[in-house]
Amino acid sequence: MKQKVSVPFMLLGILFNVCLIAANLLETKVIQIGSLTVTAGLLVFPISYIINDCIAEVWGFKKARLIIWSGFAMNFFVVALGLIAVAIPAAPFWEGEEHFDFVFGMAPRIVAASLMAFLVGSFLNAYVMSKMKVASRGRHFSARAILSTLVGETADSLIFFPVAFGGIIAWRELLIMMCIQIILKSMYEVIILPVTIRVVKAIKKIDGSDVYDTCLLYTSPS
């Protein structure tokens, strides 16, 4: 029996992957927001958590898990291609090699930290969203979205910064950076929440899906 792919699900999945890849590339630039110094990935990475919330809310944990693994695979693929391109000698007349290498030749330690943090944070976000939906019988979406994002973003930052920069940046500075990232990413979720609510309602109406993960074995691959 053929499985029909939902158009809204497919579009959100594509956007999820685009946001993750863009965030990894933007992470190479450090930007200033007022007195705060953050990476440019902050501009787009929180959107992946918002999409994760939408997918877990509408289609359940299994579909969220599928999208998370696809995001991991696409990120790994892009990183691998980037490292291969960096390793291939550039044309003698090309002057942009140094800048290209800076963007795509990310240190293996940072790449590993990013992929590890993404997996743990995203799965925690989807898990909390799924469990709270069942416990609340589908009510209080706003609270569930904010709390699940806070849990996921906290786990992401607690893994990424120590693994990527431990021993390079002072631990006090790392702690400050982690707190800033967690707070700003969570604020991002709160600010865009009215849009998220409308999108979820529209998708449920169009797609006719509203999955509750009752009695779901979360560790099962199927």
Predicted regions and their residues:
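Internal alpha-helical transmembrane segments of multi-pass membrane proteins
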Residues: 135-154
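Residue-level signature of transmembrane alpha-helical entry/exit and packing/kink sites
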Residues: 8-13, 38-41, 106, 110, ...
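A structural feature that tracks compact, well-ordered secondary-structure segments
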Residues: 149, 160-166
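Membrane-embedded alpha-helical bundles of multi-pass transporters/translocases
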Residues: 74, 97, 109-121, 132-136, ...
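Hydrophobic transmembrane alpha-helices
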Residues: 1-72, 76
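Membrane-interface interhelical connector segments
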Residues: 85-106
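Conserved small/polar residues in nucleotide/adenosyl-binding loops
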Residues: 218-222
